[in-house]
């Protein structure tokens, strides 16, 4: 939700993720493909003529944004390369030319693409989906093909993400929420359970098929440049023209919007994410080269900090770690130590309520936290501490600290228990 002020500086100006609805462009192709699959109108291995990336719909010309040089290919491949021509032709031929535009609109509504998410934050607009053949909605012969590629519809980033999250969640659509529980002094005082919007937005077969399509986009399509060797993600790139209008024989474009919506890990999704960049200023404006790198950075950082996403290096029974690999005689702030050990799921027993503690390994595969005495007006024992904790304690006592080495404190020049009177203490780290 970073915006740019007139002076060129960036600021949290407006909650665009919730409050700004735009024509999404190619990320909406997922909905078009899922509608076709749900109505059993296409097979992913069917052939489709992409006409080299240029086609005519009545008096309007449609061009594929990213050149691909393909003519006849599979429906699957047309989606991977994000062919406007391919997806638009499929929807036009199966719904438009057969007079079944109402069936396509019904499917979009089945996917809840015409409804708010209901998030408890003010300012969410209702997504815009035209009513079939409505003069009031300016329905025309090009409406269906244009809707299929993300035009003549509007949706917010959060609403689009809710749809993609449902696909990642095997069809179950959940209401977005920001708060899971409220705690006071470490105790939960109120919980907010997850709320299901719809148990299944499409059949299992259709969901399985579009999940494969989204994985294909990353493996072989418009997102392959940024696929990861450490984990697999799935998603769809999007590039949309903004404020466009026809002036005679040419089209005037007022700007672009780049986006990427996806989830990871692809085989067992835990996180979904959408990145939307309105009017990028880098000189490029394609979703695959502007928004996708941002998604990848977010996914990389999330993956690196979630230990549950890493595979165990050893599938054999755990070796006894006590006195070998578990920390022993390490000293630190008790609450910090407890937080780290809990996060790493290392069993421990706390035997002190004091501020500072020392870790001791037991004979079994566990730890115990014991009291580390910090007498007032006397030099404490900081051996085993990290430098940050040692400096905090010693400098607050009025001592001057000299440091040699890196790591944890191995030796200190002044004996613990010595009365403090502004001396200089030297710490040897290792």
PLM regions: where:
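Generic structural signal for hydrophobic residues
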Residues: 32, 103-104, 294, 298, ...
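Short beta-turn/strand-loop junction motif enriched in small, turn-promoting residues
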Residues: 169, 280, 414-415
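Generic "edge-of-domain/loop-turn" microfeature
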Residues: 55, 268, 280-282, 408, ...
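Ligand-recognition elements built from short beta-strands and adjacent flexible loops
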Residues: 130, 275, 297-430
């Amino acid at each position: 939700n970073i915006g740019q002020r007139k002076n060129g500086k960036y600021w949290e100006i407006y909650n665009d993720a919730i409050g700004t609805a735009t024509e999404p462009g190619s990320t909406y192709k997922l909905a078009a493909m899922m509608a076709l699959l749900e109505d059993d109108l296409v097979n992913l291995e069917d052939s489709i003529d992409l006409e080299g990336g240029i086609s005519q719909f009545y008096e309007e010309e449609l061009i594929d944004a990213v050149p691909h040089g393909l003519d006849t290919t599979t429906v699957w491949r047309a989606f991977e390369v994000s062919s406007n021509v391919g997806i638009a032709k499929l929807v036009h031929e199966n719904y438009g030319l057969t007079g079944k535009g109402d069936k396509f609109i019904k499917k979009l509504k089945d996917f809840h693409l015409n409804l708010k998410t209901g998030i408890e934050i003010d300012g969410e607009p209702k997504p815009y989906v035209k009513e079939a053949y409505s003069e009031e909605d300016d329905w025309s012969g090009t409406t269906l093909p244009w809707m299929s590629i993300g035009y003549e519809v509007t949706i917010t980033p959060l609403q689009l993400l809710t749809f993609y999250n449902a696909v990642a969640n095997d069809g179950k659509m959940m209401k977005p929420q920001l708060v899971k529980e409220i705690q006071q002094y470490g105790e939960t005082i109120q919980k907010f359970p997850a709320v299901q919007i719809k148990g299944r937005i499409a059949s299992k077969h259709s969901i399985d098929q579009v999940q494969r399509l989204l994985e294909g986009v990353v493996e072989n399509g418009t997102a392959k440049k940024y696929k990861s060797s450490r984990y697999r993600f799935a998603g769809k790139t999007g590039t949309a023209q903004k404020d466009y209008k026809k002036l005679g024989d040419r089209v005037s474009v007022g700007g672009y919007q780049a986006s990427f919506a996806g989830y990871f890990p692809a085989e067992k999704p835990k996180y979904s994410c959408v990145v939307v960049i309105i009017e990028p200023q880098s000189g490029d404006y394609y979703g695959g080269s502007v928004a996708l790198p941002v998604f990848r950075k977010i996914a990389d950082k999330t993956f690196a900090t979630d230990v549950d996403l890493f595979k165990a290096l050893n599938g054999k029974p755990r070796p006894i770690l006590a006195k070998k690999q578990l920390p022993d005689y390490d000293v630190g702030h008790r609450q910090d130590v407890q937080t780290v050990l809990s996060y790493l799921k290392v069993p421990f027993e706390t035997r002190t309520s004091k501020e500072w503690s020392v870790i001791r390994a037991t004979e079994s595969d566990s730890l115990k936290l014991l009291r580390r005495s910090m007498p007032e007006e006397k030099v404490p024992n900081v051996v085993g501490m990290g430098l940050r904790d040692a400096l905090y304690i010693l400098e607050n006592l009025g001592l001057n600290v000299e440091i040699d080495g890196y790591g944890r404190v191995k030796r200190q020049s002044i004996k613990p228990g010595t009365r403090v009177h502004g001396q200089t203490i030297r710490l040897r780290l290792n």
